[in-house]
C-alpha cells in the first residue's frame, strides 16, 4: 500500500488523520498521533505489510 492509497481510503471514509491514527493505535502522550499518518501519506515512512493489512480492515 502506498501513502497515496492510504490518503484516498481515508478521504473516501471522510476521516481525519487523527481518527485513523486512533483506529490504528498510534498514540503519543495519550493522544492520537496524526503525524505518523501524515508521514505515511507523504512517503516519509514506509507502510509495512502488517500495517497495510490493518488499514484495509479498519477502513473497509
PLM features: residue spans?
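Short alpha-helical DNA-recognition segment
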Residues: 14-38
